[in-house]
């Protein structure tokens, strides 16, 4: 285990990069290239240490040119570039590039610098994490994993936990992909127990602050390892799902699960599915309120994604209700196959949820969702849908549909009814904030963060806010040479000095 502490420099995942160019001089061809030990780096707003980057180039003579005056570069020898940055007094995040040129070969280093911390809050990116990050229910920890390349050119993974109160970082491994092929971060408890999916062996690993690893177990009779999706703040309850049988062979093989002190039990399932028809696959539990009282999940049959919730009573938990029952409508409709034959099905206007894990408020009073309508197309060969953000109050059992923003998704909601909405339905890159009590638009994600924390952040949307409001987890879309990446960021109180 590496036990790292808050550093003056945050360096992004190092990626070796090379640009090769063939040049012909008379009858002789020479190979020109620029090979960098690191093609991107991030700095804090102030107090940074110099960053050294290794440069291998042919021809050996190369030049480095920064794209902004706040970045300083020095070629300290034939193969070393030292990068320093001025303190960032702009109040906002900034970025630029450094161009490395060796005759006709060239490469760029992307440089990013955060704004200075203020006395109320600090903003950090988790851009070294692969496949996202999870925040614990009370905001104590954030967890994820980093990836690197082993000596044999295979992948290796390092589970990583960040203490958001102290800035301390716990890094474990790296573990070879042949042992743990880590694919997605799912959840972390306030006690620092991190759950990451294993794409090779199935199920997940669970790793704690000491580096101890175990594999969560499903109830007896299950045919696969389970997946934990969320936890309560005290770590007593975990929720998720597992397979008990095979699809199309066994009745509702996908089972929602609840663990109490590590012991798993099946959660009951509705008699009829989202379309008021016989269920054939089942579904999952996706999240649980921080206080452990309310669990939410989703059906997983075709494109239904019907959202439901349970009132947690341990092994005696009763069957769930559909989220948004007060606005849910189900009716019979005659549709057509491509060959012109007709069949009867049921269409639904109701609340849905896919694989999102942060849709419930800490005390379980509110659930964020999406209200989807279904209408037969004119030729009745397909179904036309609309989708808009919606929020359900589990105490009053009433739904608030927010249609102000067109196609949108309810991402998260606080105990006092502040809703966070993602604009669009796929590849969301921006968000707005809405007061469900007054029906008031509170502005964009950036506006709300500035109004409440006094800092300027880049565009994005909010995934989760702790019950006391001190910790925030969000998502930002970043463009790179490989396309658009979605990275997580967090807001936390300043580290005590």
Which residue stretches match the model-derived regions?
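Conserved "turn/edge" positions that cap or connect secondary-structure elements
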Residues: 117-497
